[in-house]
Amino acid sequence: MLYCRQGFEKECAGEIQDKATQLEVYGFPRVFKNAGYVLFECYQDGDADKLARELDFNALIFARQMFAVAAEFTELPSEDRISPILAELGEIDAFPVCGDLRIETPDTNEAKELLKFCRKFTVPMRQALRGKGLLLAKENAKKPVFHLCFVASGHCFAGYSYSHNNSRFFMGIPRLKFPADAPSRSTLKLEEAFHVFIPREEWDTRLSSGMWAVDLGACPGGWTYQLVQRSMFVHCVDNGMMADSLMETGQIKHHMVDGFKFEPDRKNVTWLVCDMVEKPARVAHLMGEWLIKGWAKETIFNLKLPMKGRYDEVLQDIENLKTFLIENKVKFKLQAKHLYHDREEITVHIQVLSNISPH
């Protein structure tokens, strides 16, 4: 089972089909329009576990969470939902002992009405699972996570994910608060990208104060705000106006030029960020040029998706960018995700691993 953004089930299904085939796991996706999730039915026993274990979750763009489904319950009685779940799971020898329990719903308005019930149901379910030996007495972050996903009040999927290969967030969604002084809501996209792409223990070295950053298409400053909050200095590139609150920090330089033509005077930039409304292939190529020239060491950027053929466009743009970097002998790590705060776009992160002299 994979959670995704409502309306992106088709893209999520295409992706899991491709990735499963690469691992020689065969099956078919079951897609329900606007359901906020996709089910991938494996033909062979044990293959769902193989995917949960071996399919790199971070390599999936459109999935917010993935777990192996052990059982589906379609008509749980409202007076006792626990007993049928325990009875069925007790028969499954391969079900692992878990270290955490998450009772969730897909991210749709209809399903989210069940969240209040999910919260209430968590304590009795946790006690019952512990009593049955399916859940450890104490939480253990290294053990698998037990997932119970309710799509209706009597209909749920029970399964598990591996803690080294899942999203650590409930429902796969980081809970971020919009800062009152940020110039636009887009600020949450970059904050979420930091949470998703950069391990927390590396924030002090990779997102440290005193670094220089460039924000292409910066106005009014939603992404710049995140960099300024981390005490960086920022070249803001946009023909529009920046928020006064950011100008007053003394940490930004505003360049009123086209983002495609800007070149930093001093080549001391660590971070390049970009949220320009532009053709995705053009943005991806521009990011590649910056990295190849050694003008930035890390980048986070958005690729706006077309109305049709979204998955194909994403694959093509990322493949072209990877080829461009490899041909220019750049070693790199690339991740891409359809973030919670993204709409018709995906967010890409690239860290350059080569030592490139700016030129």
Swiss-Prot record:
Keyword Methyltransferase: yes
GO molecular function: S-adenosylmethionine-dependent methyltransferase activity
Disulfide bonds: none
Keyword rRNA processing part of the UniProt annotation: yes
UniProt-listed Pfam families: FtsJ (PF01728), RlmM_FDX (PF18125), RLMM_N (PF21239)
GO CC, alphabetical: cytoplasm
Example GO BP: methylation
Coiled coil segments of this chain: none
Highest taxon in the source lineage: Bacteria
Listed EC numbers: 2.1.1.186
Main location class: cytoplasm
Keywords noted in UniProt: Cytoplasm, Methyltransferase, rRNA processing, S-adenosyl-L-methionine, Transferase
Catalytic reaction annotation: cytidine(2498) in 23S rRNA + S-adenosyl-L-methionine = 2'-O-methylcytidine(2498) in 23S rRNA + S-adenosyl-L-homocysteine + H(+)
Catalytic center residues: K304
Similarity remark: Belongs to the class I-like SAM-binding methyltransferase superfamily. RNA methyltransferase RlmE family. RlmM subfamily.
Subunit structure: Monomer.
PANTHER family from the UniProt entry: RIBOSOMAL RNA LARGE SUBUNIT METHYLTRANSFERASE M, RIBOSOMAL RNA METHYLTRANSFERASE FTSJ DOMAIN-CONTAINING PROTEIN
Classification via HAMAP family: 23SrRNA_methyltr_M
The name this protein goes by in its record: Ribosomal RNA large subunit methyltransferase M
Organism: Vibrio vulnificus (strain YJ016)
Taxonomic lineage from the root: Bacteria, Pseudomonadati, Pseudomonadota, Gammaproteobacteria, Vibrionales
